[in-house]
Amino acid sequence: SKVYADFTQLNELPKTQLGQSHYFEQDSEQQNIKVALKNNGDHIAFLINLKVVDKKTGELVLPIFWEDNFINLLPGEERMVCANFKGTSEAELKVEGWNLE
């Protein structure tokens, strides 16, 4: 018989607060984004997912090349993450996470 991992306790992770700032840079037909993240809470910030969407349509900007994503941050930990993508339309950052407030 197969045995599967039980990840149900992840649903019990306490909520935590994530601080973030970011900026976009246009370079001819390419855009770059730099995102500064900081876990301001007392618990791990689990599986932080960064997305860039077109501001007008709300559609995901693809392809996008992140140097890292689905990040975990311990309490007080900070991280800078960069990405680049083609296009000149106005974009915005969306930040999601397993246990973010």
Where are each of the predicted segments found?
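Beta-strand secondary-structure signal
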Residues: N32-A36, N49, M80-C82, K94
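Short beta-strand and strand-turn-strand segments in soluble, beta-rich domains
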Residues: V52-N69
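Asparagine-centered strand-capping/turn motif at beta-strand->loop junctions
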Residues: V35-D42, G87
